[in-house]
Curated annotation (Swiss-Prot):
SMART domains: S_TKc. Activated by tyrosine and threonine phosphorylation. Its EC number is 2.7.11.24. Belongs to the protein kinase superfamily. Ser/Thr protein kinase family. MAP kinase subfamily. HOG1 sub-subfamily. This is Mitogen-activated protein kinase mpkC. Its cofactor is Mg(2+). The gene is mpkC. It comes from Aspergillus niger (strain ATCC MYA-4892 / CBS 513.88 / FGSC A1513). One of its GO terms (molecular function) is ATP binding. The modification Phosphotyrosine is found at Y173. The lineage of its organism: Eukaryota, Fungi, Dikarya, Ascomycota, Pezizomycotina.
Length: 396
């Protein structure tokens, strides 16, 4: 039986197995505390997320179960990978995943991104989205802080706590405002995978501009900023996606003409602007899919249809159709933990040798106590494809 060690991290009790050492706080959110740690079996740095009060009510228990199931099911190079999961003596749930040096939000606030970075990050983001959507999953909370990046320019999408099945009726409060699709603001219940494409488009635009494209102060201001760029939504679109209340409001707005994309991104690649124009469209049915976006000329240098996999199976959402008690959710989570350890992660752990640190301003929390980089190369073709000036930019 595993031995557990107890630590106090930011006033929170952290109970981890003796497999992990050198815990350091990385981030604290509403639903979990994340620490970096050192895995003494694989000799790799990892991230350990403690799910906050997972069994305090049925809603949090369901959310915990959903995230565990999703991380077990979704296995892709551009998604955060689950390497371990355990339940502590205090009955807290801990998820152990890859640890990458920084996230896109931190990167965007540290220095402007060169166009080659924007192109490669866009490719990986859409490559990951293609896989997620092929599993019948909508992320629903894509934003720069949920996009992790390491010193090799490898990108992984994380935080599936809000992910959902695509279905006709869906709850509305999802995604950070700046990256929220207009159909979510206008209808609050009817939307699909296209909301992720909108969010991804906002992220690409932010990489190109160096600042958010639609930094709304509230929902109304957010929608006005969108219409400043795209013009008023067509009547047939708002009649399809709006509720009666929002329909009257949108139709009463002053008429605005769309702004030429080139004026919003004067120094950007024409192909990048063209792709943005296909991602940021009011009508969700006309938005480009992730799979089609990968075929766009802007991404032709990286596009490889033989290396852009889809999920082998659709994700099983049947658990969401039943109202379980807290004890039932607890048993289901325990079962998933046992199943994970019976099967194990799909990939063998990779042991790497220490190498030089990247620019500290890029990855301020990237080093473990031994001076090793807390990442490993993910997409092997990145080292082959990125040219030398990109590597020098990251000081690798």
């Amino acid at each position: 039986m595993a031995e557990f060690l107890r630590s106090q991290i930011l006033g929170t009790t952290f109970e981890t197995t003796n497999r992990y050492s050198d815990l350091q706080p990385v981030g604290l959110g509403a639903f979990g505390l994340v620490c970096s740690a050192y895995d003494m079996i694989t000799r790799q740095p990892v991230a350990i997320k403690k799910m906050m009060k997972p069994f305090s009510n049925a809603t949090l228990a369901k959310r915990t179960y959903r995230e565990v199931k999703l991380l077990k099911h979704l296995r892709h190079e551009n998604l955060i990978g689950l390497s371990d999961i355990f339940i502590s003596p205090l009955e807290d749930v801990y998820l152990v995943t890859d640890l990458l040096g920084t996230d896109l939000n931190r990167l965007l606030t540290s220095k402007p991104l060169d166009g080659k970075f924007v192109q490669y990050f866009t490719y990986q983001l859409l490559r990951g989205l293609k896989y997620i959507h092929s599993a019948g999953v909508i992320h629903r909370d894509l934003k720069p802080s949920n996009i992790l990046i390491n010193e090799n320019c490898d990108l992984k999408i994380c935080d599936f706590g809000l992910a959902r099945l695509q279905e006709p009726q869906m709850t509305g409060y999802v995604s950070t405002r700046y990256y929220r699709a207009p159909e979510i603001m206008l209808t609050w219940q009817k939307y699909g995978m296209q909301v992720d494409i909108w969010s991804a488009g906002c992220i690409v635009a932010e990489m190109l501009r160096g600042k958010p494209l639609f930094p709304g102060k509230d929902h109304i201001n957010q929608f006005f900023l969108i219409t400043d760029a795209l013009g008023n939504p067509p009547d047939e679109v708002i009649e399809r996606i709006c509720t009666k209340t929002t329909l009257d409001l949108v139709k009463s707005l002053p008429k605005r003409q769309p702004a030429p994309w080139a004026t919003l991104f004067p120094d950007s690649d024409e192909n990048a602007i063209d792709l943005l124009g296909e991602m940021l469209i009011f009508d969700p049915d006309k938005r480009i899919s992730a799979a089609k976006a990968l075929e766009h000329p802007y991404l032709s240098v990286y596009h490889d249809p033989t290396d852009e996999p889809v999920a082998e199976q659709m994700f099983d959402w049947s658990f969401s159709e039943v109202a379980h008690s807290i004890d039932e959710w607890k048993i289901m989570i325990y079962t998933e933990v046992v199943d994970f350890h019976d099967i194990g992660p799909t990939e063998e752990p990779v042991i790497t040798e220490p190498f030089l640190s990247p620019d500290p301003s890029l990855s301020p929390e990237v080093l473990d106590p031994l001076g090793q980089i807390q990442t490993q190369s993910m997409v092997t073709k990145s080292a082959e494809t990125l040219d030398q000036d990109i590597l020098q930019y990251l000081q690798i």
